[in-house]
Amino acid sequence: MADSTARTVKDVNPHEFVKAYSAHLKRSGKMELPEWVDIVKTARFKELPPYDPDWYYTRAASIARKIYLRQGIGVGGFQKIYGGRQRNGSRPPHFCKSSGAISRNILQQLQKMGIIDVDPKGGRLITSQGRRDLDQVAGRVDVTIA
């Protein structure tokens, strides 16, 4: 890909973008971490809290990317996206949603920062400032073709 072309979030590797944007969120210092961030599990089906101390920024970057790509997702949608398989011992496993409080808190933080806004039809949409911010970070991500 030529250096003169502008890169958007859609052009870069999702994993690399989420890492870069979570580092950007941490550096900016605009995001307030809740006091429960180091003790909470991310879902009912999890046994332990996340090992990564910066998991909150990573989840926020992932949520911002998902709203960029698909407008109108709300808390319930993110509960389904981050949900997973609950193991029930000898009984069969079933799908279980993730925590809604974590998604709600991150959406409120991103809204306070001006990256997303409430959609009148339901869910959240990305603002023009948020789109510009995410595209700037995507422009700094290295594009390596394997």
From Swiss-Prot:
What is the gene called? Answer: RPS19A
Q: Which SMART domains match?
A: Ribosomal_S19e (SM01413)
Q: What is this protein called?
A: Small ribosomal subunit protein eS19
Q: Which UniProt keywords apply?
A: Ribonucleoprotein, Ribosomal protein
Please name the GO terms that the record assigns under molecular function. Answer: RNA binding; structural constituent of ribosome
What's this protein's family per the entry?
Answer: Belongs to the eukaryotic ribosomal protein eS19 family.
GO BP terms in the entry: ribosomal small subunit assembly; translation
Which InterPro entries does the record match to this protein?
A: Ribosomal_eS19, Ribosomal_eS19_CS, WH-like_DNA-bd_sf, WH_DNA-bd_sf
Cited Gene3D superfamilies: Winged helix-like DNA-binding domain superfamily/Winged helix DNA-binding domain
Recorded superkingdom: Eukaryota
Give a yes or no for keyword Cell inner membrane in this entry: no
- GO CC, alphabetical: cytosolic small ribosomal subunit
Checking Pfam families in the record gives: Ribosomal_S19e
Q: Which organism is it from?
A: Oryza sativa subsp. japonica
